């Protein structure tokens, strides 16, 4: 493996003192993925699965639980497009079950998946499918809103429209999310905070 992909080696260059090592911590945002096999020997520098997660959570902090955040992994390759992200929830649940066999290690305690909120009212069926496959771990969705007119600025992977937070269909989708007592996670640029503020005022019960 080339040094370019030696991420653990890069991280190990600096060791910081662990503050309050006994304080229980929930890691609120991580991903899990197989990644492509890119090296001639079949090794995979992009892989990040349960053992890799534990390697990080056992760095000296007292990390008890974690929350998985959607990253487009293991989507179904069949069926209606809107339901394909449910495959990611199923994938993470299986890893969570593996983790439960090692109760002394950090446990995956929540899943934030993806549902296209532009489905509007129809998003409810997809949310319910995630919830069924989530076996008690599915907590909500991330639909990122990051957008900028400057082509040199990377827009969010979910390909949002310019003012997606203000779209009627998007807000109707979030109403379904709120009605199911699920949470909404997003990311956006600073110049979109005003749109998010309008959204929050329009849906005050949304978590």
Question: Which residues does each PLM region occupy?
Answer:
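Helix-coil boundary/capping segments in enzymes
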Residues: 1-207
């Amino acid at each position: 493996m080339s040094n370019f992909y030696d991420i653990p080696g890069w991280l190990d260059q600096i060791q910081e003192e662990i503050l309050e090592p006994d304080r229980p911590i929930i890691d609120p945002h991580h991903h899990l993925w197989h990644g492509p096999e890119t090296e001639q020997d079949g090794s995979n520098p992009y892989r990040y699965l349960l053992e890799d997660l534990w390697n990080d959570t056992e760095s000296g902090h007292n990390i008890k639980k974690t929350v998985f955040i959607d990253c487009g992994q293991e989507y179904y390759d069949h069926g209606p497009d809107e339901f394909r992200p449910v495959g990611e929830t199923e994938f993470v649940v299986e890893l969570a079950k593996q983790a439960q066999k090692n109760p002394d290690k950090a446990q995956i305690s929540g899943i934030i998946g993806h549902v296209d909120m532009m489905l509007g009212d129809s998003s409810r069926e997809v949310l319910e499918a995630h919830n069924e496959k989530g076996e008690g771990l599915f907590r909500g969705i991330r639909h990122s809103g990051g957008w900028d007119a400057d082509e040199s600025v990377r827009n969010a992977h979910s390909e949002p429209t310019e003012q997606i937070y203000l779209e009627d269909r998007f807000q109707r989708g979030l109403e379904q999310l709120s009605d199911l007592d699920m949470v909404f996670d997003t990311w956006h640029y600073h110049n979109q905070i005003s749109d998010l503020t309008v959204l929050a005022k329009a849906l005050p019960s949304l978590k």
